[in-house]
Amino acid sequence: MNHIFRRSIPITARLPSLGIRSLATATASAHPPVQLYGLDGSYASSLYTAAVKESKLDNVEKALNKLSGVLQQRPEFEQYISSPWLTREDKKILVSSLTQMTGNEPLLKNFYNVLLDNHRLYLLTRIQKQFSTLMRAKRGEIEVKITSATPLDSKILSRLESRIAKSKYGKGKLLVSNKVTPSIIGGLIVEIGDNILDVSVGSRLNNLNKLLSEPI
């Protein structure tokens, strides 16, 4: 049978041999700060646990962020790593390239091998995003995305940030960004973590203030 059709190796069975313990056996200090869901969340959580135990959280985060930048600049490379038709030699070359891109970190090299063995390399971008979620939670950071039809000036962004910080949603360090989407006509979409507030520009900040003032 062609090796690409092999049965997937369970993550909890494969990771321990690489020094990556499952969440069930992780110590309290190494436990991820928030629970993630999905296969990408499971891999990100296992990588987080391993990085904590080896005191390599910052190194792994920087390396994955760097890799994410490369994949964004070279979409053809992301298509390649997602291909189910890679030969054994292709895989060796691929792991070597990924390892070099991320600073020759042994922990990540092992992790890439786990993904390859399980035919899950296509999850790499999503795993990076999930890992970033864990790191933001560890630092007590809250991502705030404000989508508008045109760029918002610094005064408006400051007012929004100030109001959110005083609301039930502002329990942490806010990381505010403004995304411009012309199709958002006459409105703002404010994403605070997992919460989404759709606010009409016609009433300016009144509706937003009302939403933010609601009791928890």
Curated annotation (Swiss-Prot):
<comment type="similarity">
    <text>Belongs to the ATPase delta chain family.</text>
</comment>
<dbReference type="InterPro" id="IPR000711">
    <property type="entry name" value="ATPase_OSCP/dsu"/>
</dbReference>
<comment type="subunit">
    <text>F-type ATPases have 2 components, CF(1) - the catalytic core - and CF(0) - the membrane proton channel. CF(1) has five subunits: alpha(3), beta(3), gamma(1), delta(1), epsilon(1). CF(0) has three main subunits: a, b and c.</text>
</comment>
<comment type="function">
    <text>Mitochondrial membrane ATP synthase (F(1)F(0) ATP synthase or Complex V) produces ATP from ADP in the presence of a proton gradient across the membrane which is generated by electron transport complexes of the respiratory chain. F-type ATPases consist of two structural domains, F(1) - containing the extramembraneous catalytic core and F(0) - containing the membrane proton channel, linked together by a central stalk and a peripheral stalk. During catalysis, ATP synthesis in the catalytic domain of F(1) is coupled via a rotary mechanism of the central stalk subunits to proton translocation.</text>
</comment>
<dbReference type="Pfam" id="PF00213">
    <property type="entry name" value="OSCP"/>
</dbReference>
<keyword id="KW-0809">Transit peptide</keyword>
<protein>
    <recommendedName>
        <fullName>ATP synthase subunit 5, mitochondrial</fullName>
    </recommendedName>
</protein>
<dbReference type="GO" id="GO:0005198">
    <property type="term" value="F:structural molecule activity"/>
</dbReference>
<dbReference type="GO" id="GO:0042776">
    <property type="term" value="P:proton motive force-driven mitochondrial ATP synthesis"/>
</dbReference>
<keyword id="KW-0066">ATP synthesis</keyword>
<keyword id="KW-0375">Hydrogen ion transport</keyword>
<keyword id="KW-0813">Transport</keyword>
<dbReference type="GO" id="GO:0046933">
    <property type="term" value="F:proton-transporting ATP synthase activity, rotational mechanism"/>
</dbReference>
<dbReference type="GO" id="GO:0099617">
    <property type="term" value="C:matrix side of mitochondrial inner membrane"/>
</dbReference>
<dbReference type="InterPro" id="IPR026015">
    <property type="entry name" value="ATP_synth_OSCP/delta_N_sf"/>
</dbReference>
<keyword id="KW-0472">Membrane</keyword>
<keyword id="KW-0999">Mitochondrion inner membrane</keyword>
<keyword id="KW-0496">Mitochondrion</keyword>
<dbReference type="GO" id="GO:0045259">
    <property type="term" value="C:proton-transporting ATP synthase complex"/>
</dbReference>
<keyword id="KW-0406">Ion transport</keyword>
